């Protein structure tokens, strides 16, 4: 057998620390999942809007989008 499970290690309760006591309330909702989709759709909408924003910024940076009346060169800024 390549691996062996040590039952003594699995049954020990672990070490109690002050950091663990502080972080315990954050883990109190473990395993509780709200039914339904929740805010998943809203998250998807914001992800799509952010992706569109990144594409627009990338196209402006690459100068593949030429805006009418707005020069894209650094020389025009001086």
Curated annotation (Swiss-Prot):
Annotated protein name in UniProt: Photosystem II reaction center protein H
InterPro entries: PSII_PsbH, PSII_PsbH_sf
Localization, UniProt: Plastid, Chloroplast thylakoid membrane
Keywords: Chloroplast, Membrane, Phosphoprotein, Photosynthesis, Photosystem II, Plastid, Thylakoid, Transmembrane, Transmembrane helix
Subcellular location, principal: plastid
Residue list for modification Phosphothreonine: 3
Organism: Spirogyra maxima (Green alga)
Database matches in PANTHER family: PHOTOSYSTEM II REACTION CENTER PROTEIN H
Processing and modification events after translation: Phosphorylation is a light-dependent reaction catalyzed by a membrane-bound kinase; phosphorylation occurs on Thr residue(s) in the N-terminus of the protein.
Similarity remark: Belongs to the PsbH family.
Described function: One of the components of the core complex of photosystem II (PSII), required for its stability and/or assembly. PSII is a light-driven water:plastoquinone oxidoreductase that uses light energy to abstract electrons from H(2)O, generating O(2) and a proton gradient subsequently used for ATP formation. It consists of a core antenna complex that captures photons, and an electron transfer chain that converts photonic excitation into a charge separation.
